């Protein structure tokens, strides 16, 4: 592929279909050549608008029924910086791939900014990530990075005209691919005589991208100083303030202390800047970060929030990259459930627009359409055969839940030291070395044990064991099911043991000109062979007032799925939930839309 001619290349997937892929610009020459040849239009979704209030994650985690709306602008923000094995993996394919167990992200409700990160010069976010984030009202930034002995900035900073040319190129790329800005990460020395032009670059880029892209952002990474030295400050101070003052925010390196955060907060106020423009780095891999990252990332986040500062969560794909895909789903939910009390849920707007979700996360072992498996025609030894088609495509991700898996917060965390005999420890020895010297050696490893109301989780290195607690739970919860689906690659399993409590699912703002009609597609596996079923009760909230709505009609779609229609006299909704009798129920789809004309004269009498 000649990447200097276009940002798009081609590759061949398992199905022998040629598909386009999106790749970074690795050099300044590649970038300039691509702009000379013209950038290719991509299927990008515009960012969804959100209301001006948010909900505290702490209230949601505590299962509060009545949630307080707080001013979004007054709360610290959350930035997530993607860093997954260098980037541009299966996510680079515009048409997706069949690698269904690749890394995905779905906790969009608590994220304000998503940064796609790689170690290539100009990192353009793949359109699957842009679409998934935009659907949930989340801004997306690309990354500009130089490292080591890279001398690219020597060329860019020759003159202010060269600075403008590069900045204008970055603005054009962001505008063409409809993302909201850039993270600037310069991790190499800059000649001292070029510092003024570097500051000018930050200023010019920030001012002009604001003119071209609404609500755009330029964020400076705490690396090179105002004398051109590569010297991470881990705080806001005189050495990096000139960059901070000319952009929208600073991403502090991870090796900070509580006192440095306090000094940063005070200094920002002295400079007349909002303290929430400081994004404190939290490395999930723990590299020098207070608390050591991982499932103890809450230690760092608690210190950050005590100062009222924003957070930049770096490399949350740790749950997939370190532990592997087989345990990803449960570990991802556990990880974010711990952070949730320190985060804020923003609320997307659906104004005169249908809300529809099948809960698909953008991947699956098989694609389903209206409850039926989608098969693909394959050629095997010149014989035609049909088989299930696995898929990975973040552009297919549906609106995701606003809330974490209930009761997943840890109630207890302990650790113990495991002492292992060298003679029996094949994992350590790997059959190598002098066995006589190794037999008497012992090796120690730390096993960390976490408990919540549902499970006991044992973690030793990258090996995880999850045990269900023996006592029967007295609470309701849910989990994602990837074994079948109504539309897409999965559905939502609702586990109900207390039918007096409902399942909160979405915090949104739906405002229609007509009365709302809702649809729920569901199944109870125990009722597949007979007609015994218990239809879900739809819960809709409006400004703290919850209404329970019984189905107007219920029909069987196929052998597995049933569809319920709900009629309401509501036009505005800010919460969606479901109430069930004691059972395991799988939700395949939820739709809220204007009432169908055939029901226009129907009197609503099924609310309670």
Protein language model features and the residues they cover:
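Exposed low-complexity, polar/acidic, P/S/T/G-rich flexible segments that act as propeptides
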Residues: 583-607
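Substrate-binding cleft of secreted/luminal carbohydrate-active enzymes
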Residues: 284-421
